[in-house]
UniProtKB/Swiss-Prot annotation:
One of its GO terms (cellular component) is cytoplasm. Pfam families: Ribosomal_S16. Belongs to the bacterial ribosomal protein bS16 family. Keywords: Ribonucleoprotein, Ribosomal protein. GO terms for molecular function: structural constituent of ribosome. This is Small ribosomal subunit protein bS16. It comes from Dictyoglomus turgidum (strain DSM 6724 / Z-1310).
């Protein structure tokens, strides 16, 4: 199963994270399929960059976001766009 999750990057005690699509059986920092964004919680406010179009693609292909990534997607409205896209596809079918 493909998951959208965080992989840790950055120096010791200065974590930053990449938002990636990867197989759920891979280790946290293992081989990823695609980089979908970046999250730096240490800045004030936290720095977040998202490739919205690619995230929507992976969600439409059945990728499951982790709880942390889901909260980020909800905060930036990507999850709502996915639900609307899913609902419109269901009603037109």
């Amino acid at each position: 199963m493909v998951k959208i999750r965080l992989t840790r990057v950055g120096a010791k005690n200065k974590p930053a994270y990449r938002i990636v699509a990867m197989d759920s059986r891979e280790p946290r920092d293992g081989k990823h399929l695609e980089i979908l964004g970046f999250y730096d919680p240490k800045t004030d406010p936290a720095t977040i960059q998202l490739k919205e179009e690619r995230i929507l693609y992976w969600l439409s292909q059945g990728a499951q976001p982790t709880d942390t990534v889901l909260s980020i997607l909800k905060r930036y409205g990507v999850w709502d766009k996915f639900l609307a896209m899913k609902k419109s596809a269901k009603s037109s079918a």
